[in-house]
């Protein structure tokens, strides 16, 4: 068997490149690190072999010495006499055996010669094994005889000797870099650099021409080992390593220049489109070649181009559009450190203090109260952060306490304090205070249940008797109930309460505002809870059962969010603590806690720990490989944080399973070694270290981006599966069993993903990359989760991996600082009185709930039951949904938009806080308005109470909020201190958010304070006020072109900003005159210089506003259009943005058409040339639930891609934006898949050829451009042609529109489906009795291919006239088909789209298991009416621009129309909506005929746009 020879290493091999450290050691004559390592490895190997040597090894060694000999070709078996002719078949290639033979040959060769018996036994064993090997080797893998091949005997090669040159490195340093001829030594280093950058250069450039080498020898013959050995044997202390580094840098620059010269160039065609400045808030990614030159002269005809887009569109009329070209595909992603981006190097600002010291639990916990600051009366000042309830019914408070200021030391991780600025008049302590975490355990908390007595007692059968209920009777029954429930330590007394709310339990409802005597039962919270619908013979119902102990504690003790509390009667615990807080105390009763007298004292600083977790998939589990944390111990909760750079950071990382780190990673003394990085040996060790770090840092808040949906979930899952002993350290409460639902007790969680969704509603993408770019102007590098493994290949990549993860933690702090998350959410919580962690999770419904609970409890009202239902909705002005998902009441009024392009000024008027103002104006409250249900279960329409009724609680609360905000804003204007001014601004924002959310609790069906009649009253009054405002505008002879809920758009027709502003203020004053002495008020919200109004809630405008008295500025604003929607690709958005910029830029219509034509043709050319980037076709859509929970996943492309991503091990959670591209699909299949089955993740799309361009053109690009250009009169078929869509499917649709001679017929006969009512209607098809052709009837007149008009009743194939009776018969059959569908009452599921008549009787839900869809009727009465009305519209005989219809329509067709009209009307007459008396719409001086004549004349005067080429 031949030993494989080791290949000689070439100096140009990347694997043999040596570092400067090796050269340095060789220069000093020392052994190099690789030599030392090899010697250690060899020594360890020999020692291990000797230790593992056994008797079996000795026997095996004897056999090998007997049966194997060493020849020229290595080891081979000895041949017996009977097998000499088959000697070649015994050739082997087992490297492991070869390795063993080396050792055996050296130290075991003589054993067989001294022992004859062992020798004979070994011979026999060897021969048996040889025969078995021969039998196997004679056949191949398929069992066929193996063909013998003669073995070629290899000759032993001799190594090429290299003449030692100890000065070659010195010669390399002294030679000039720019020399044309490269020396032997320079070639070595130059070659080395080229090899290390082989991914950017062609392999042909990695070696130098042999003619350029000196006569000393060729590069291929040089050996780096020989060079270093020469230097090591003859040390040269004068070798300058710094010069060597400089020389290497020069060669790197030279290499980069060579790479640029060899880099392929991609040319793109551009069109000259000059003159309009573009919006830089939108990412064009266009390539602008020349800088723009501006000139204030309007008559300047100089062609200009621009280098960037701009958010401001100037008032100047420009004639041409900027030159631009769409981008090419970017290069592959590289490993980029955050330090190489535009972000500042925050690591350099940290010092030795940035290292987190990890100590044992007993080292960081205080042993006594010496450092704790107590009050003179023995009470303790405690700042509340969060509240928990344990299984025993105890209340546990977590917060912070003050430490003695005179003591210099403090408990570890307690959080350093900074000087806080107060906005109160109280003096600020100059001595910096120190704080530590604390836990307060309330041993005794109680529940309160209120029993409402009956008027008459019930008998045993539940029937009412004539016996009146007395106090003695009800008290006796309640005591029996308590004894039966084994409740102890209770109190029972009679109290007075008022009812005002609606309950889900019917027998709880009572008259509004009526006072009752009820029996209050107070008992410990750790005992049983009564059923919510409980009733007895002497009591009708019970209230307060659903209130939790935490809720009662906050309400009864009047605790309004995070604030200072005074705790008396405490017992400090230092042994057998129940928490990991630094201090722990116990109180007997909740009454020992009350708000502090100094509740306005500055809040203690927060210790915030942001974390970022990286994991790899193994099976279905995420295995954690790295956790980074950045810790800030002094974040202000009252205002901006002053010292934002005072941070600590730490990273724990482990090697991938089955691998090791690179040898020089975190090597002691190395320049790349990081002091804040801890290497862990396993995942279990990493998680244990992380938990210990949390214990030492003791953070008050965990922060992270999607930390709730990913980081915490992954960490807890791995802690549980790996059974990490320290798992409880992640929270502040000691636990003996794992609790996934209450895992981080005592610490707040700030998820920047949820926070940004609430406070940055205009963002389109809430990924950390996009938020960093848009909010912080930072180009954050992103880790490819598909390939984390490559980061572990080298030390450099590992360090980049760590830096990116640490940087993610730091960016979270930057977002927190910018949005002032903690001060703002604290103010919101202080106003509402709820818990801080719920405000951080953007639970807006709970804020209003607690605000009203505090107010109604203070007035002694019976509180409504708590609703334990999940819903993603939060209510709003659009009308709530009932249980069948229908609108329970009408929302805001939306006036029909007058779709057009307005190139003169439009003003926007907006009611200030419309719904809160209505609640105050009309005294809308639970306590002032009776709600009555009809017999059918629906609510009667509520009416405003009389003015004599006292103001309700809702109007009072809102009035208090509005007054408070007004006062805060007044103080803010007078304040000079920037920090205090920022605090005032935070407070007024919080008040505004609370006030504007008040209406939501009325209309949100899952709200605790849901009151549908009140919500309907508010929206009804909103509609009335908007309609009243529109009427006033019309009386002033201005045109209301659109209105929505609380705003009006008014066309002024003027051409200057000042004139428009004057008109707007005039209209504002006129409307506000109707509300004198009222809180209702309308304001001038905006002035639009140009407006493209598409449809309801969709428009684009150029908004102009005043900077100072003489200067104005314009900005683009889009609402609801395609370029702001996530489900449109960037190419569609770019084109749409360009077109809108052009239209709003003030160009003449003729110029617009030509410029748009040129631009679209250039886009077409780039599509043909495949020069567009694949990324331009990415569509994103939000995943609303788990991918497996979708019943219609097969037709949802983003769900399909999400499932594909999960199959690859990617983490996809609800709420994430899923990107995908529509491709050609499976090219091997002859049948093309549906488009939703051809969706792929962007990483799976290799090139532009894989993208289905036709789908994007027809489904995204063309419809978007058509909508944007529709108001200016551009035709869809021309747009399609300019985009290269010349296929028959587009041509058939638009060919007949090109005939100018028949333009008059277009509005009536060719575009009859444009009415939104008929969008889903099907056309009438009739069969020709002569040729059997199926014809679609589009109108009484149609245009043929030659532009001639012909009857719509003629066959398209044989052009024969369809007989009248045949047509009438087919029309009746067609209508009866739809009638049959209606009468059959077929239902279709909204989720799985199953058609059936079966459904769940109570809820109309789908009968299929696991399907949550609702069964809806396929053919409803409204659909049937619209369908038949559509037929009526098709058979109308009035032409839009012709006074004499008889000259166009033949008599024969007139008779056909008449009979068809009679058939259709006979069906329509059966519908109620068809028989409408229009006389009610007329004035006394009008008649129906005169009104019809007026409509006909108005219709004839309409001028339809004609395309000017």
UniProtKB/Swiss-Prot annotation:
Any single Gene Ontology cellular-component annotation: alpha DNA polymerase:primase complex
EC top class named in words: transferase
Start-end of CysA-type zinc fingers: 1328-1358
Coiled coil: 27-67, 234-263, 958-989
Main location: nucleus
PROSITE patterns membership: DNA_POLYMERASE_B (PS00116)
The keyword Metal-binding is assigned to this record: yes
Entry keyword Cell inner membrane: no
SS bonds (residue pairs): none
GO biological process, one term: DNA synthesis involved in DNA repair
SMART domains xrefs: POLBc (SM00486)
Pfam families: DNA_pol_B (PF00136), DNA_pol_B_exo1 (PF03104), zf-DNA_Pol (PF08996)
Acidic residues bias: start-end ranges: 80-123
Family to which this protein belongs: Belongs to the DNA polymerase type-B family.
Protein name according to UniProt: DNA polymerase alpha catalytic subunit
Gene from which the chain derives: pola1
